């Protein structure tokens, strides 16, 4: 078959009219022709780092939207569902991905659980990593989140890194604010990428060490404008909500990059040839021998996708998608008893005391990095009381894996004036996490999730809404628009409750991730990521 148009060459930074001859899904030859065409043909877009589960969609439902935006391949790290269901969860992602023309490549989850300091539903051993990396659809070792384990030469993680080297597959990193000697130790073991950088200085140091840097432009962390001139290597999503995906994927990132001043040819390379070469994919350029994964766009400013071709087959054209997802539902149970309000109380050490100084988590918008601070709170009826007026709320993590333990603390930055929000999406172990103004609301929100087998929920003095996520408590089998509409209604309720965070449930979901600085809440209590130690909630009572 022949495909004609204005061809963009990622090697020479030129566009010329030509025809592409395709046989058996592979580009056979390219010939320049003397003709006038309207659209530009570019290589299919590749998202080099994404967790599909964060979209709350199954792989096939995700593909229904991503393909419309010119995404033809993704490098997916399934460590979210792996933390909940182990290999059963990974197999589910692979099986559902096969139902779509979108090319799914996977990374083997290296840190399940993310650290030894939290409880998850499964453990991914070196033997499992060996099995996964021996398979062609697994193209790398997934982000090595427990960088402290690497730095301290812990046996299990080094064994996983050794296995990746055996199969000559790259090792993805996760090194927020890692610097100096510790960064050099991390890189020395073979970790080659990072998507956690937030400053040009951080990027520069990692680049000097030979790392390849991914600019993260997702729903919560948006670094594209800040790092656009930092000589980065890829643009990635990492975590993307369904409502954001509907409005654009890598096509939207390209529009932003050009608006911020990046050369469009360079921007396109960050989502085509660069990830293809790094992960050894037969894609990324329009050249002989490569897969015929092509995207027709209107121009190099708007990047409006007109047509998508994968393996020579048209998948999307004239605003019509030529495939339909049919995900398989799976039954998931949260192995936790219904809670009582008193389960969320933090008791004073001495009931005679009137006040307590507590350590707490400080949350900021559009970043998953938190800060540790302290505040003085009153003690009433032997219980430490939050200060809603000062935006100091209660935060709890509920063990969903049969332990029936609840750890309680305090958080500042959510702004909720009455009610509670709860989620079974809680990186990376995905226990239930809940923030609220009092224990009664927190118990009601948590029990609502337990009864619904997972999801997101908000309860105030006026309303109750949810997004049900029956697949591992992480994903829905419903279409993206349904999930996005339900999510939008839920976020509107949370906004009416006083929360000013742009993505409250995304922010909430990262409050229990003990590999991103500075302090996080786990099933075992408040954890300082920098010192790698648990912290007492109560500093002092009087």
From Swiss-Prot:
Enzyme class, broadest EC rank: hydrolase
UniProt entry keywords in alphabetical sequence: Hydrolase, Manganese
Protein name per UniProt: Adenine deaminase
Source taxon at top rank: Archaea
GO biological processes: adenine catabolic process
Manganese found in the keyword field: yes
EC number: 3.5.4.2
Catalytic activity: adenine + H2O + H(+) = hypoxanthine + NH4(+)
Cofactor requirement: Mn(2+)
UniProt key word Manganese: yes
Protein encoded by which gene: ade
Family: Belongs to the metallo-dependent hydrolases superfamily. Adenine deaminase family.
Gene Ontology molecular function terms on file: adenine deaminase activity
Matches recorded under PANTHER family: ADENINE DEAMINASE, N-ACETYLGLUCOSAMINE-6-PHOSPHATE DEACETYLASE
InterPro entries attached to this UniProt entry: Adenine_deam, Adenine_deam_C, Amidohydro-rel, Metal-dep_hydrolase_composite, Metal_Hydrolase
């Amino acid at each position: 078959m022949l495909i004609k148009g204005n061809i963009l060459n990622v090697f020479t930074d030129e566009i010329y009219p030509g025809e592409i001859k395709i046989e058996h899904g592979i580009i056979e030859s390219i010939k320049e022709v003397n003709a006038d065409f309207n659209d530009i043909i570019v290589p299919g877009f590749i998202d080099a780092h994404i967790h599909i589960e964060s979209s709350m969609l199954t792989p096939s439902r995700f593909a229904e939207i991503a393909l419309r935006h010119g995404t033809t391949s993704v490098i997916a790290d399934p460590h979210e569902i792996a933390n909940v269901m182990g290999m059963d969860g990974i197999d589910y992602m692979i099986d559902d991905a096969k139902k779509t023309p979108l090319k799914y490549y996977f990374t083997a989850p290296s840190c399940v659980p993310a650290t030894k300091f939290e409880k998850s539903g499964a453990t991914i051993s070196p033997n499992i990593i060996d099995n996964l990396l021996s398979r062609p659809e697994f193209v790398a070792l997934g982000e090595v989140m427990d960088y402290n384990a690497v730095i301290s030469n812990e046996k299990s993680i080094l064994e996983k890194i050794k296995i990746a080297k055996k199969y000559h597959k790259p090792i993805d990193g996760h090194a927020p604010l890692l610097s100096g000697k510790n960064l050099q130790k991390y890189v020395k073991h073979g970790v080659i990428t990072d998507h956690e950088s937030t400053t040009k200085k951080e990027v520069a140091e990692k680049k000097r060490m030979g790392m390849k840097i991914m600019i993260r432009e997702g729903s919560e962390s948006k670094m594209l404008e800040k790092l656009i001139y930092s000589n980065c290597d890829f643009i990635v999503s990492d975590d993307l909500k369904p409502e954001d995906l509907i409005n654009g994927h890598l096509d939207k990132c390209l529009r932003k990059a050009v608006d911020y001043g990046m050369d469009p040819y360079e921007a396109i390379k960050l989502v085509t040839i660069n990830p293809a070469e790094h992960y050894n994919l037969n894609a990324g350029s329009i050249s002989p021998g490569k897969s015929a994964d092509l995207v027709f766009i209107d121009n190099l400013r708007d990047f409006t996708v007109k047509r998508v071709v994968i393996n020579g087959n048209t998948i999307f054209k004239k605003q019509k998608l030529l495939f339909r997802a049919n995900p398989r539902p799976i039954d998931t149970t949260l192995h936790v008893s219904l809670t009582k309000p008193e389960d969320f109380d933090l008791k004073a050490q001495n009931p005679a005391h009137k006040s307590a100084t507590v350590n707490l988590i400080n949350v900021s918008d559009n970043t998953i990095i938190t800060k540790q601070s302290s505040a003085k709170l009153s003690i009433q009826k032997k219980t430490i009381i939050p200060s809603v007026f000062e935006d100091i709320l209660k935060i709890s993590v509920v063990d969903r894996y049969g332990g029936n333990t609840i750890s309680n603390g305090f958080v500042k930055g959510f702004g909720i004036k009455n009610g509670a929000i709860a989620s079974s999406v809680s990186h990376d172990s995905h226990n239930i996490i809940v923030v609220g103004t009092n224990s009664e609301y927190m118990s009601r929100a948590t029990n609502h999730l337990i009864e619904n087998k997972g999801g997101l929920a908000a309860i105030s003095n006026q309303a109750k809404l949810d997004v049900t996520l029956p697949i591992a408590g992480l994903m829905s089998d419903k279409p993206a628009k349904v999930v996005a509409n339900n999510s939008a209604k839920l976020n509107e309720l949370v906004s009416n409750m006083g929360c000013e965070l742009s993505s409250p449930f995304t922010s909430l979901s990262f409050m229990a991730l003990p590999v991103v600085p500075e302090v996080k809440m786990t099933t075992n209590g408040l954890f300082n990521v920098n010192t790698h130690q648990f912290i007492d909630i109560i500093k002092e009572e009087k």
